Curated annotation (Swiss-Prot):
This is Thiazole synthase. Pfam families: ThiG. Transmembrane segments: none annotated. Its EC number is 2.8.1.10. Catalyzes the rearrangement of 1-deoxy-D-xylulose 5-phosphate (DXP) to produce the thiazole phosphate moiety of thiamine. Sulfur is provided by the thiocarboxylate moiety of the carrier protein ThiS. In vitro, sulfur can be provided by H(2)S. It is found in: Cytoplasm. The gene is thiG. SUPFAM superfamilies: ThiG-like. It comes from Bartonella quintana (strain Toulouse). Its main location: cytoplasm. Gene3D superfamilies: Aldolase class I (3.20.20.70). GO terms for cellular component: cytoplasm.
Length: 257
């Protein structure tokens, strides 16, 4: 079971809710893949006006756990204010904390992230911290009270898959008891399987499903890939070798006459 701030979930795949062709397709993708958690931007709710309110009502009817996020924030003040508004709107202390440092790469501003996390933790929030694959940053986020760390594996929406598996593996090795979720950069089910094989606890993605030719089928594919990767990690994956090793042991040699 996936444990997030004391709450347990069966699914280790989380989905974003943006860019789907229609609400009906989003609903089917969630149901067919047995997703239990979706993330949604407060800015979508507020900027959308009446339409945003309708979307929130749509989410409530799905009877699913909502993880609000601070997507689109560039400063500590913006992120803190957005988180506080999200708590009022969604009635949850959960917040996926994102602070962007560069508008082109959408790379997290880890300095502002740590500062905002400290403020929000002192205000009672339970933070899911979207960050880079830097171990030192992850450790600092833990120091200020975060209990779920969400390293990216590649830039948001790029679909490139894990760039730095050594870095991701290092975070897992040094933080064995921390809940780690890969967030951003996943493009195909095999990427999700790799992330889970590294020992990560869950995967969060959006574009790879929302922009697929068949989002519902792709959501199912990702759900199965995440499950397979987790099972492989738990089973114990064979380490790669530089030389061939016979898979069938030879006891003696056949004698031909």
């Amino acid at each position: 079971m996936l444990n997030l701030y004391g709450r347990k979930f069966s699914s280790r795949l989380m989905l974003g809710t943006a860019q789907y062709p229609s609400p009906a397709i989003l609903r089917n993708a969630i149901h067919k893949s047995n997703i239990e958690i979706v993330t949604v931007s407060l800015r979508r709710e507020t900027a959308g006006g009446k339409q945003g309110g309708q979307f929130w009502q749509f989410l409530k009817e799905l009877d699913i756990t909502v993880l609000p996020n601070t997507a689109g924030c560039y400063t500590v003040k913006e992120a803190v204010t957005t988180a506080q508004l999200a708590r009022d709107l969604f009635k949850t202390s959960w917040i996926k904390l994102e602070i962007i440092g560069n508008p082109d790469t959408l790379q997290p501003n880890v300095f502002s992230l740590i500062e905002a996390a400290q403020i929000l933790n002192s205000d009672g929030f339970q933070i899911f911290a979207y960050t880079t694959d830097d171990l030192i940053v992850a450790e600092r986020l833990l120091d200020v009270g975060c209990r779920v760390i969400m390293p990216w594996c590649a830039p948001i929406g790029s679909g490139q898959g894990p760039h730095n598996t050594d870095g991701l593996r290092s975070i897992r090795a040094y933080l064995p008891d921390v809940t780690l979720v890969i967030d951003a950069g996943i493009g195909r089910p095999s990427h999700a399987a790799v992330a889970m094989e590294l020992g990560y606890d869950a995967v969060l993605l959006n574009t790879a499903v929302a922009k697929a030719g068949d989002p519902v089928l792709m959501a199912q594919a990702f759900a199965q890939a995440v499950q397979a990767g987790r099972m492989g990690y738990k089973a114990g994956i064979l380490k790669a070798r530089n030389i061939a090793v016979p898979s069938t042991p030879i006891v003696g040699k056949a004698v031909f006459s």
